[in-house]
Amino acid sequence: MKIRIAVAIAAGLAALVAAPQAAQAMPHDHHDGIRYASVKGCTVKGEQRPCGEWRLMMHSGEKGSLPDAETIAREANGKSSHTQVAPIAVSGNGRRVAYFTKSGRLAVRTMGGGVKVFAKDALPRVAQYDVTFQLSDDGGRLATVFATNKAVKTRIFDTATGALLGSTPGGQTLLGFSADGGELLTEVSADESVTDLIAYSESGEQLYRATPPQIVAANSPSALAADGRTTANVVMGGAKSQLVLYDMQSDQIIAKRKVKLPAGDLNMIDWTGDQQVTLHLVQYPDGKANKMTIVQIDTETGAVKVRDHYSLLKDSYVFAACGG
Amino acid sequence: MRYTSAAAALLASAVIGGLGITPPAAHAQAGPSQVRAAWIKTCTDKKNDTTYPCGHWQLITRDGGKLTVKDASTTEIDGKGRRLDDAGLFAISGDGRVIAYERAGDHRIVVRQAAGGPVKVLAASLVPKRYGTSPLSLHLSPQGDRLLVDSTDEKERVPTKVVTIATGKIVELPAKDSMNGFSTDGGEVLAQRFNRDNTLTLIAYRTDGTSVRRTPSQVVANSAMTALAADGKTVAVIISGDEEAKKVPRLRIYDLETGDLSAGVDLALKAGQTPYLAQWSADGRLTVLVQTGDEGSTAVVREFTVDTETGAATQTDKYSISKTRYAFRVAGE
């Protein structure tokens, strides 16, 4: 789940908390989950900055908020950065959201459930705008990535207990969790001017490292399947778009599927089933609200099905959509 | 490439003959007739603090001498004939014996012996009327018998042209390809194509119109440069060094026909010495050029012969180019 500076969203957590959803049998029952989180922007003393609370836009159309969440990032010393947006992430299934509380603690809130506030020292003391969160599809795992000048290890947490499960090397780009949350995929610049993909277990053990073919490396990002070794990436090319499946263990392209995609730039790619990859496609029409289209691709056939589409709140300054 | 033996001198004569232009007898031997590089001076417009090329193209000869190419255009022109602030087209063959350039006055492309003598004026059609010489670049084959006229016009309208100088025959190559250079014997042109799926394909075009192509692995696609051997399939792949990571440049050998890629060797150069030109010699050795000196300081060019098995590098030449340069071109570039 990535924060995209450009657009935004808002949602009402309070509303969510008030109306817990009973039916949770389906892992991808998006109807009671968050579509995206958004914060408004305004101009203060000539500078653009986030204003107001994080808004949570739900699949049901309801709108909640996250009153306990920080929207303006704090510096490492705890002072406000005034203009930078604090990080936020929504799990793939839209049921959990990770953020910094107003008191500067890391928190993961479950829709219709409670909030897990992490230990004070869960994260190193760095500026909040140098921190990125990524939740697994079910929100059970959280990765915290640090974009500080000095490489700091990425930390992986169990969001139910707050326990630190492991860490992966800093200085790499975290692409995301595998479909079941058991592994992570990173991308790193390696020797000889190439880009490598690395799969780690949630405890930080390196499982596979590969220098993929051009068609994978040149069409980033890739997403990791539940098996922890198969990646998917998309070549965005209008009518010539294709889904590429790659096996990190054997260093082989497994399949290329022609896919017919609706308009939009690739915002996110995630595995959401053993034979399903979900894409978030975003459009930025001039003067209008940004549009998101979410499609599910059958990895066996290349068939594309639109799962959801919506217009983002027009006053969004920054938004974070659910991944799955 | 240097010709030191009698046989080589004969070969040189043959090449000159092949060029179809009459060399002045006094310059038909090795020595002052070979040039290492050409450069053109920079001037500053004090009003808006911009620089532009000025004066004449100067040749730096193998024996350290200087020659002026008075009829070479200082600048390029656009489609309306207006002079631009880019240096005029210029190229030197790999052996340093032949030069090609944009002629002052009519901006036609001409070729002649580096040492002097009459020019051979090439077809007017080599310069697209729509763009002038501005999108073009010239590359001479190692022996100076063929000229590549590459175009980087944004709309990819202008095909690359390969001119056989003795006959004037022109072969067109796809406009969307970018040209890496000739093979050692001038028999093929190595090109690369950026595909719609964001990958890069290497293509060797042969004179008979056929080609060999392959989409290589990342390490080849992301390399600093490639050079095609006389066999038309063996590619030297130079991988950039990384000063920050203290990694020296590396060499791998890629076979364009089979896709085989060697494990590679570290080159016995410094991390900051990534070669900017590589050429196979006729006897299968690899020559690389390393340049130091940024704009405004003296450029130093070092030539090394590289052992492709071990990466050992032996310096075989070194020369400098004035800090007052606006642009320079080395032999074989």
Tell what function each PLM region has.
Chain B
Residues M1-A30:
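Secretory targeting and sorting signals
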Residues A28-G94, Y319-E333:
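Extracytoplasmic low-complexity, Pro/Thr/Ser/Ala/Gly-rich segments
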Residues T74-I77, L84-A87, A124-G132, I170, ...:
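Short coil/turn segments at the loop-to-beta-strand junctions that recur within blades
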